[in-house]
Amino acid sequence: MHNRHIPPKGWRTPNRFSRFVIASLIIALLTLPLACRPTPIPTTAPAPTTIPTPTPDYLSLFVLPEDGSDVILNAIDDADESITFVMYLITNRNFIDALKSAEARGIEVRGMMELNPYGGGSSNVDVFSELVEAGAEMKWDPRSIKYLHEKMILVDGELMFVMTCNMTSSAFTANREYGLIDTNPDHIAEVVRVFEADWNRQDPGLDNPLLVWSPINARAELLELIDSAQSTIDLEQSSMLDPEIEQHLIDAARRGVTVRYISSPNWPLEDDYDEPARERMRQAGVLVRYLDDPFVHAKTFLVDGVRGFVGSENISTNSLNNNRELGEIFEDDDSVERLAAQFEADWAVATEEAFPVSELTVPECGYIDHQDARKFFYREVTVELPVLYVYNSGRVAWLMPDEDSDSNFKVVIFPGDFGKWPEMPDVYYGGKIIHVTGLIKKYRGWPEIIVHNPEEIEIVGETGQEPGRMPAN
């Protein structure tokens, strides 16, 4: 249990520190007929095997999806007294179950969540209720802020995670994310102070914060970080929607700083809100590339190769001015080195074109397996899918291979087209093996084909199983 990022029990005593190994990313491949298996896409960068021995003021960077969820789940499992968390969006079942197990063994669990996450539906309400029923103390976001977008977990008041990621399956399997593990007592005291103030609906009253908080000091800290650059700025960002930050990056490029910017495009590109900023930055000399897989949900800066930033703050006016956000600027050598190495790996596979079409050949059988759909983004192909799980909320219907709706290929049908089928599509195709033909698009890092007509789906067999059904929210 203690061979990941987190120190083993007894870590509070300096002479008991020991090395531990980061979990390697494990990729499970479905065995397919050789004629229908395309050449696999290489991973961008392997996870390192070791990190430095921690100290009482320990700081370490972890990278997702390479390092997996054990770094967080093991910390929760090892809690002796308390778990405190703030999270914008929670859908990951392992995280939910770990919190419930901690509460069941007598650990005090307290958490704050966002009531209305953008595009999150009612999932947070369901998770909130489930945790309350398990005995956790829970509160919604303070109404004084726009969104509670912070991503923080604190274990036993002494081991803290500051992250770019929500607790979703996509965060650990499909997204480029980063997190810091921090044991600095002054940093933790500041986080506890803000948590308690938000919990009690009070002003935290931070005059000179050590960390990067929205809406308190995030804008000023990020501008100072950008303006301090002498030679290089490397950033991986999920959005670019703040004119002032954009202008300071442009100014840096114009004064001779090499600025490299990685983000993920949204389809279609003409509807991507970030594309106008990308183009303005490109015209000003910023080097812009797109990383399609993994999906960039990160919020990072690396300046002159010596100062890094990781946090929940998006480059958006709302994030910096109105949300509760948390980030950290750091100069720890090992953490900066890992951030730099991952950026270089991502830059090497990122492209100047937004949606490069893969050159992989569709097998001779004429279709691909659903597990290979991620290798054929933005191509019109035929996908074979055993419909073993279905969902219909009345607002959308999904056909899926299993119950993990966050991290698999799915067929999507909207209610305006339901009447084209003899019965509801989820009922009609449940338990069938289908060939669906269409453009493979990306949604939250995972592939889907949106279907409008029955002619786009061919039933080719039976699964022999009664399909499972996700409950409608």
What do the PLM-derived regions correspond to, one by one?
Residues 4-22:
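Bacterial N-terminal signal peptides that target proteins for export
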Residues 25, 29-55, 355-363, 466-473:
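Ser/Thr-rich, Proline-interspersed low-complexity disordered segments
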Residues 51-80, 86-227, 243, 255-307, ...:
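HKD-type phospholipase D/PLD-like phosphodiesterase module
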Residues 194, 199, 353-360:
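Pro/Ala/Gly-rich low-complexity, hydrophilic intrinsically disordered segments
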Residues 334-355:
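Amphipathic alpha-helical interface segments
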Residues 359-473:
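OB-fold single-stranded nucleic acid-binding module
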